[in-house]
């Protein structure tokens, strides 16, 4: 956890310092909130079906892998058990084929991340299952197909929750035609973030919402080191044990914990829940970066209009002290209220009209 936190801070600092000037151009034109909501909403049905299918396949696979009671050839033949585990893993990999291809191409582009770690574990587990099926050996137990398959299923579940969160967020943005924005400003107070509410457009909100979450950011920095550590530890374990026939089983074991299930869904699930609850109040947050800015803010600007909205304020009466000129008092008071931008302006005007 400490290494992950350090990696996240270092990567965040590097991104802030070495941000590309043409980053906005690389993202392309920002879609409208309506189009973004339709796009992510359209992905939900497919992802929900694929996620459920993957989870259903994982249930018997986990049951077998835990060594729980089985019957028939599954109990008597290690070859059959290894082949069954392999077929179930390949089925889940086929259901989550985009996860596998993304992981592979990220490795080819030398930008490994969480999905690359899942891909590597799937490869080693599948090869290990093939070797165990061919040799018929039960000396090391069953392959780690359940871990690999469940990792792919968690990736699908994470994508499903992310799409749901974006659907709620962008639908709320599309409904409100004149929203108030709460933004994080780093120029109000030096070296710190200040949160303030204002009337401004929401340009850039969608692109900012779609930026990588904490797990992707952390593991983009950690993945190369985890891959290197897995190779070194796998080779050391094989050499020290002297059992070179089980090298694939060792590599499957050391790569299995590199992409923990919690990391795959650490942000997506709470983001979906928060986005749904915020949408019920007509609010939305710009993904992980919006939540991070609010969490790291140290100052908050609150105005009269935030505390005392116009619909909740009324003036009972005006009392002018003896010796004062009523016309001047009313004129000066009205000028001060209007100049201050206070929500008392409309209330004071209504009172003057009623008393005339």
PLM region spans:
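Short beta-strand-to-loop capping motifs
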Residues: 1, 19, 320-322
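Structural motif at membrane-water interfaces of alpha-helical integral membrane proteins
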Residues: 12-220
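Hydrophobic alpha-helical transmembrane segments
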Residues: 89-99, 148-174, 186-303, 329-344, ...
């Amino acid at each position: 956890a400490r290494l992950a936190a350090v990696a996240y801070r270092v990567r965040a600092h590097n991104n802030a310092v070495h941000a590309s000037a043409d980053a906005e151009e690389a993202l392309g034109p920002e879609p409208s909130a309506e189009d973004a909501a339709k796009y992510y909403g359209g992905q939900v049905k497919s992802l929900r079906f694929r996620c459920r299918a993957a989870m259903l396949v994982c249930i018997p696979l986990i049951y077998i892998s835990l060594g729980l009671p089985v019957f028939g050839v599954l109990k008597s033949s290690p070859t059959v058990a290894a082949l069954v585990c392999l077929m179930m893993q390949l089925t889940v990999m086929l259901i989550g084929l985009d996860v596998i291809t993304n992981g592979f191409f990220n490795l080819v582009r030398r930008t490994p991340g969480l999905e690359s770690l899942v891909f590597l574990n799937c490869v080693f587990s599948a090869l290990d299952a093939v070797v165990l099926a061919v040799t018929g050996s039960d000396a090391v137990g069953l392959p780690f197909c359940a871990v690999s398959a469940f990792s792919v299923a968690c990736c699908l579940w994470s994508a499903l929750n992310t799409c749901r969160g974006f659907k709620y967020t962008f639908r709320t943005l599309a409904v409100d035609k004149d929203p108030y924005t709460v933004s994080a400003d780093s120029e109000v107070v030096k070296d710190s973030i200040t949160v303030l509410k204002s009337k401004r457009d929401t340009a850039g909100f969608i692109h900012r919402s779609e930026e990588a979450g904490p797990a992707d950011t952390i593991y983009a920095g950690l993945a190369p080191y985890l891959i290197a550590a897995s190779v070194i530890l796998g080779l050391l374990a094989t050499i020290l044990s002297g059992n070179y026939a089980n090298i694939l089983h060792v590599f499957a074991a050391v790569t299995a914990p590199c992409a923990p299930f919690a990391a795959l869904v650490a942000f997506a699930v709470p983001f979906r829940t928060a986005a749904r609850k915020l949408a019920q109040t007509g609010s939305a947050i710009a993904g992980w970066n919006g939540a991070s800015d609010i969490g790291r803010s140290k100052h908050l600007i609150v105005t009269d209009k935030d505390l005392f909205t116009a619909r909740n304020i009324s003036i009972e009466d005006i009392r002018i002290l003896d010796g004062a000129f009523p016309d001047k008092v009313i004129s000066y008071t009205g000028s001060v209220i209007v100049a201050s931008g206070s929500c008392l302006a409309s209330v004071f005007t209504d009172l003057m009209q009623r008393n005339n």
